Amino acid sequence: MITTILAGFPPGEHAGWSSQTTGLSVAEDANLARREEDQRASRALGARTNWIDIPAQEYGPGASTSERLLRIEQSIVAAVSTTEVRSVFIPLGLTHPDHIIVSDAALRAVLASDVESYVYMEMPYGQARPGRVRRRLRRIGRQCNVDPLESFVGDLRRKSEAVNAYSSQVETLQRGFGKYFDRVFTDPERYWRVRPLLQSPNR
């Protein structure tokens, strides 16, 4: 199951990232196009899709940071409970405010549960900014145990198909990240196990 947390949108037209990259001025149309990309990527990986209707930051905060953090945390708790998953993979949260708040909320949600939890490095942000990876890991390490796992390569053909499913974003990311974006297709994935501070590594 691949869950997009911030998949909500307001009515009417909006000139944000989703509309700019899809070429669709109406927020609903732009986000439905993005959901179709989610589905294509998930099919390439043999996964199912799930969306939570909380708007991304591009549509305006609508609430204080603490209120938004709590709402996201509660939505993740509910999603984990209803899907009965045994493990959760969380973005490390490197640069984008949406990634960071989702990472923070997810860590709060899953560390209070019995679900096995992991963080992963978002590409190409991690390749382009390795210093941020180290700083973020140190920050997370102040609230939980963080244990590096062996890098994972996986099926590069399926990975390429999944990345290219996001046709509305690929060109923009390619221009913005250049060689670092090219590495998305070949670099191994990086993961860390996260555990409550008092939990033993064998649990």
Protein language model regions, located:
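Active-site beta-strand->loop->alpha-helix modules in alpha/beta enzyme cores, enriched
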Residues: M1-D114, E161
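The feature marks non-catalytic terminal segments
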Residues: R34-D53, P61-E67, A78-T83, A112-R203
